[in-house]
Amino acid sequence: MNYYGGKELAESFRTVRKNTLAIAQDIPEDKYDFRPMPETRSVGELLAHIAISNGFQKKIHAEERLNTLAGFDFPSLMKRLSAEENTPRTKVQMIELLTKDGEAWAKWLEGLDDNFLGEVVTMPPTGTPPARTRFDMILSVKEHEMHHRGQLMLIERMLGIVPHLTRRMQERFAASAAKK
């Protein structure tokens, strides 16, 4: 028995996506083109990457239920996902994409059972490690989003925006201090 199954994956992913959406809403649309360095993704590009990049795991587990990645056509999938990421979007469209895609992914996660999550997927011949469980691979979607959300929070600071989670913490501290 797993203590962390499909329902828990879905709920934790929804929490992560809710926080990503808060950042997407807090950053003004005229700053979506901001990039900290020329060779980095802009705010809009990071948000698009977050919204689209789970397409890799979706293809492997939800659409094709592959048990091996040997022979998988990575270049074709990456080309398609890259084209989707590079589609120009307004702030409203980006928030809609993050919302719609996030909820569709979470609903799929909710239906996963322990047997499915425990299945092993063999990596390509040069893959390290040579095999991973579906649970590990699917969990990486949330980990990947949190990685990029950390970048977005630093960008918020560069833009003079206090991240929403920091604002909440400051409000709690201020309320606690006011009671003393």
Indicate where each model-derived feature is located.
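Short alpha-helical transmembrane interface motifs in multi-pass membrane proteins
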Residues: 134-136
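His/Met- and acidic-residue-enriched segments that coordinate or traffic transition-metal cofactors
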Residues: 1-6, 10, 21-27
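Conserved functional hotspot residues or short segments at active or partner-binding sites
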Residues: 39
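Short, helix-capping/interhelical loops that line the mouth of catalytic, cofactor-
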Residues: 1-8, 53-130, 159-180
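Alpha-helical transition-metal enzyme core signature, strongest for iron centers
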Residues: 13-20, 43-58, 95-105, 138-152
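Surface-exposed patches in mature extracellular/periplasmic domains of secreted proteins
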Residues: 33-36
